[in-house]
């Protein structure tokens, strides 16, 4: 077969060399061989090729340019510079029935032999490379079976991994340049593998192909990896979010909550300082660690447009001061706007917009494996009349509700039972033997947050609470009786809601947690049902028949 024919069919032939000690991989661009060479010139190399079709006994000279040629002692002339590299392995020939191919040795087409009524068993094919020859041409076939791209990729990948395994533990510019360059003196960029190998092997990282590179290419390699890194995985360190108590200017008190007090303060501008009560832990030495791991870590790893912007935290075990510093939002809570500003009329588009923003924030928190545990309209702040931010997440804990200790009582706010899912309400049981609550944590989950959003969605649609002014024990009893019994009194009010919204609300309020949709699914459904604003052109068209000027 001619050289052009071999090049066209893409035959690969490689000569693998081993050395007594190796530290880098080097390939001569003209001889088409890959060898392991030591940086010391005193050691000799030994040939370990599978066959002796193209032995190389002399060590390769130092490559000063891309045109250096390795000497060969074989009688076979060295391949031209344009010849593709090969590796010497045996063919695995089996009978073939292919008639629409030609012999790769004599280049005769098999169909002509079939017309001359020769036996089909006279055609043989290799299981590895797919070469097809006549039976009479088997003796003329050389042991140069074409390797597959997967096989070649495995050889090169293992070679690079073995030679750079220790260096990759602490990647540096020098270590990357050693693994990607052929020799210290090489100044040009050459390819160690065929185009097919570079295309099919390592598709996810294009620059981790078996190509040589200069120091400039190494800089590009590092920059592209940094661009591919997920920005959400680059989290702030604890030192970046630690704030000294003296650096925060605490001013006026905004309000009190179940878990602490909120103050208006200053920290490089307006800020909200939320002091968290950690007195429920009797062991004072554990308060700082629990505060950092359970509360601060959730805020530190969260960045979203509809989540309260986190500045840092204050932890001072000496003075028993633990606080979270966030951005200050001058508007009131969503509860205040829905239930206290009764004179304001809300259109349906505003309801959809606020609901969508809440679900987007909660979908982000659930993606980060963070549970809110206390999703209510009082924990949703208004940045402006049409934008909300979610706050006070990861603060809910049964031990905080039990503090200070009372006889068979629990300190809960108004309408808190309305946001509890049935599986959470079922755990609010009292141990009458010890006159205290059971010492186990409430089973909060992503589904319980979805149930809480269902109550918020009901408030946005009807501007009232689902259970009205009932006492907490009546609400808890109705919750334990099942969802259908609790919704019987709401049938008349739910008739005012659109059918699709009614269906979404009931799915969020399902008594079976596995049947509740995720926040990601709710975002898609609200986006589809959200009314679109009518453009000015459409308004003119709709009123054209009423205006005689049109």
Curated annotation (Swiss-Prot):
Annotated spans, Disordered: 21-87, 172-196, 530-550
SMART domains: TyrKc
Domain named Protein kinase: residues: 248-528
InterPro entries the record matches: C1-like_sf, Kinase-like_dom_sf, PE/DAG-bd, Prot_kinase_dom, Ser-Thr/Tyr_kinase_cat_dom, Ser_Thr_protein_kinase, Tyr_kinase_AS, Tyr_kinase_cat_dom
Gene Ontology MF terms: ATP binding; protein kinase activity; protein tyrosine kinase activity; zinc ion binding
Residue spans, zinc finger Phorbol-ester/DAG-type: 90-145
GO biological process per UniProt: meiotic cell cycle; nematode larval development; nematode male tail tip morphogenesis; positive regulation of vulval development; Ras protein signal transduction; vulval development
Signal peptide boundaries: none
Stored PROSITE patterns: PROTEIN_KINASE_DOM, PROTEIN_KINASE_TYR, ZF_DAG_PE_2
Domain of life: Eukaryota
Keywords: Meiosis, Metal-binding, Zinc, Zinc-finger
GO cellular component: cytoplasm
Gene3D superfamilies the UniProt entry points to: 3.30.60.20, Transferase(Phosphotransferase) domain 1
Low complexity bias (residue ranges): 21-56, 63-75, 177-193
Phenotype of the disrupted gene, per the record: RNAi-mediated knockdown causes sterility characterized by a lack of oocytes. In a ksr-1 n2526 mutant background, causes larval lethality.
Comment field on protein domains: The protein kinase domain is predicted to be catalytically inactive.
PANTHER family, alphabetized: KINASE SUPPRESSOR OF RAS B, SERINE-THREONINE PROTEIN KINASE
Family in the record: Belongs to the protein kinase superfamily. TKL Ser/Thr protein kinase family.
Oligomeric form and interacting partners: Interacts with ndk-1.
The protein's role, per its UniProt record: Probable inactive protein kinase which positively regulates Ras-mediated signaling probably acting at the level of let-60/ras or/and lin-45/raf. In the germline, regulates meiotic progression during oogenesis and mpk-1 (isoform b) phosphorylation. Plays a role in meiotic recombination events. Functions redundantly with ksr-1 in the Ras-mediated regulation of larval survival, the development of excretory canal, in determining vulval precursor cell fate during vulval induction and in mpk-1 phosphorylation in somatic cells.
Record protein name field: Kinase suppressor of Ras B
Organism for this UniProt entry: Caenorhabditis elegans
Gene of this entry: ksr-2
């Amino acid at each position: 077969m001619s050289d052009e024919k071999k090049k066209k069919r893409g035959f690969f032939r490689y000569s693998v060399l081993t050395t007594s000690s190796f530290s880098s991989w080097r390939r001569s661009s003209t001889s088409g061989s890959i060898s392991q060479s030591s940086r010391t010139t005193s050691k000799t190399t030994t040939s370990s090729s599978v066959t002796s079709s193209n032995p190389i006994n002399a060590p390769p000279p130092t490559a000063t340019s891309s045109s250096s040629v390795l000497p060969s002692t074989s009688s076979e002339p060295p391949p031209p510079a344009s010849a593709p590299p090969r590796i010497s392995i045996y063919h695995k020939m089996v009978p073939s029935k292919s008639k629409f191919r030609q012999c790769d040795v004599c280049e005769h087409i098999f169909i002509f032999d079939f017309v001359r009524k020769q036996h089909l068993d006279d055609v043989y094919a290799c299981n590895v490379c797919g070469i097809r020859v006549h039976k009479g041409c088997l003796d003329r076939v050389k042991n140069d079976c074409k390797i597959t791209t997967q096989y070649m990729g495995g050889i090169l990948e293992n070679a690079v991994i073995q030679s750079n395994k220790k260096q990759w533990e602490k990647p540096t510019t020098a270590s990357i340049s050693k693994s990607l360059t052929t020799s210290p003196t090489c100044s040009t960029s050459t390819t160690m593998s065929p185009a097919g190998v570079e295309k099919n092997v390592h598709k996810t990282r294009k620059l981790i192909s078996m190509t040589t590179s200069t120091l400039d290419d190494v800089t590009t390699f590092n920059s592209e990896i940094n661009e591919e890194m997920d920005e959400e995985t680059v989290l702030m360190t604890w030192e970046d979010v630690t704030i000294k108590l003296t650096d925060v200017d605490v001013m006026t008190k905004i309000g009190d909550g179940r878990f602490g007090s909120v103050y208006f303060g200053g920290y490089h501008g307006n800020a909200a300082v939320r002091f968290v009560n950690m007195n429920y832990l009797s062991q004072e030495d554990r308060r700082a660690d629990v505060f950092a791991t359970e509360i601060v870590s959730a805020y530190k790893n969260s960045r979203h447009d509809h989540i309260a912007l986190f500045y840092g935290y204050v932890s001072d075990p000496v003075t028993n001061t633990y606080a979270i510093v966030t951005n200050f939002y001058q508007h009131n809570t969503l509860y205040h706007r829905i239930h206290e500003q009764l004179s304001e009329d809300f259109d349906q588009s505003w309801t959809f917009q606020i609901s969508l923003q809440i679900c987007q924030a909660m979908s982000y928190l659930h993606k980060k494996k963070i549970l809110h545990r206390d999703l209510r309209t009082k924990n949703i702040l208004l940045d402006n009349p049409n934008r909300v931010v979610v706050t006070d997440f990861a603060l809910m804990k049964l031990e905080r509700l039990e503090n200070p200790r009372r006889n068979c009582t629990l300190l809960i706010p108004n309408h808190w039972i309305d946001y509890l899912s049935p599986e959470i309400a079922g755990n609010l049981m009292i141990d009458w033997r010890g006159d205290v609550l059971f010492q186990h944590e409430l089973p909060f989950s992503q589904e319980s947050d979805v149930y809480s959003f269902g109550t918020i969605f009901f408030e946005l649609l009807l501007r009232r609470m689902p259970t009205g002014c009932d006492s907490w024990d009546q609400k808890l009893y109705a919750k334990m009786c099942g969802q259908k019994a609790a919704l019987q009194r709401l049938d008349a009010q739910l008739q005012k809601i659109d059918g699709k919204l009614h269906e979404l609300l009931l799915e969020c309020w399902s008594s079976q947690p596995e049947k509740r949709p995720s926040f990601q699914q709710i975002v898609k459904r609200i986006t589809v049902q959200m009314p679109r604003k009518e453009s000015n052109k459409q308004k003119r068209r709709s009123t054209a028949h009423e205006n005689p000027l049109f």
